[in-house]
Amino acid sequence: MSDQNIKKFFIIVFTTSFFSLAVALYVEYVLGFKPCILCIYQRIPYAIALLISLIAFFNGNKKKLLLILGLTFMASVLLSGYHVGIEKGIIEPIFSCTGDNINALEKEEILKSLNNIQPDCRDVDFSLFGISLATLNFIISFVLTIVIVYIFKYAKK
């Protein structure tokens, strides 16, 4: 695979990552849906992919960056797969994902705590085309991982 095609792929990854983060932030801040903790964690690989794509666009060593990008999206597949499993009731959360943070005894503290409750990771509050954002993230990350493995295998050093 030529360097020019790899460069185009990094542009696609940059665009996909930018769009994915933009949608997540739009859903949160414009539409008003508060994300669960796993939804927030799932943004991290896309932020890393943005940075890697920018570096790759200006750096000559694309193969190493492809490897890092592949590992990043593999982590995204695992994280989003875990989240989808929780949403579907297949997997029980390992850590508190329920938003049960009301340990306050005073009225003011209880009211303040109610405003800061994280949504339960099992609940799908927002979906696109009937598919949860965690499921869409899993699909996007899985496809990108497969493409990255293919490109890595056939890329020039």
Give names to the regions the model predicted.
Residues 38-48, 111, 129-143:
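Membrane-interface loop-to-helix entry segments
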Residues 4-15, 55-77, 146, 150:
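Interfacial segments of alpha-helical transmembrane regions
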Residues 16-23, 49-52, 72-82, 140-147:
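Membrane-embedded alpha-helical transmembrane segments of multi-pass integral membrane proteins
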Residues 17-34, 54, 87:
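Immediate flanking context of iron-sulfur cluster ligation sites
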Residues 150-157:
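Membrane-interface capping segments at transmembrane-helix boundaries
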Residues 23-28, 75-90, 107:
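C-terminal TM-helix exit segments that contain a strictly Trp-centered aromatic cap at the helix terminus
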Residues 33-43, 95-98:
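Non-cytosolic membrane-interface motifs at loop->transmembrane helix junctions
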